[in-house]
Amino acid sequence: MAWSQSADLNLLGNQHFSKGFYTEAFQCYAQALEVDRKNGDQRALATTLGNLGNICAVSGRREQARAYYTEVLELQKILGEDRGISTTLANLGNLSADAGEWARARAYYLEALDIMNMLSDYAGKAVLLTDLGLVARETGQEVEALAFYQESLVLMRRVGNEAGQADVFRMMGRLYLNQHRLDEAQSCTLTSLDVARRLKDELRMGGAWYVLASCHEARGEWQKAIQYLQKVVQVDEKYQLPKLAENTQRLQALLTRVGASSGVPHE
């Protein structure tokens, strides 16, 4: 009975999470955690703690997420859940990457990759390769990053992960943007946007719009950059994303710049 209650709460939390309603998702997971702690079911507890780690990670509560993931990892090692261990290692790598701890992130990712290769976990590996691509990009290894992204895209197609394909194309767009290869950056990002629209995935659409705004800004096409960034801020506001304030400030700076160049003050 307790397991069923925990499972139902986690399912409801997952539904909220998938829609970007993070506060409601956290509340469901927190209730499930109370049930699991009382019940003593280690597998159910590991699932709930993992979900709490995920929600804290996307909400910018990095240290809280790290604590949840660390407890999950201990439970998974006790239970011998190799697939779960690889996922949690990747999640810990993501937290390190978010903090700019690139060497630590890479170490977590490579440990996870070893397990995924052992398990022939192509779906997990496809995502992990994008993580390794991010580390390579941020540490100046852009050729290696592109190779990771291209290998990931092959696997994403193999396992039918369309959302993942949208992510990879957006990441390739950002990489090309960093290299000032603006045509390639825009092409990849528009492909990402097309996939996200087909999936009706507003969060991924927002991610693509953000890169497109940067592409147009790099070209000096301020009005187009503003149009895309306004869409980004709308998504940030709807889902209360962590970069709302930063993106709003960037939008205001662009509006001010356009107003100044046209001689018309912006209210």
Predicted segments with their positions:
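Alpha-helical linker/edge segments of TPR/alpha-solenoid repeat scaffolds
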Residues: 53, 214, 218, 251-267
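TPR/TPR-like (Sel1-like) alpha-helical repeat modules
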Residues: 220-241
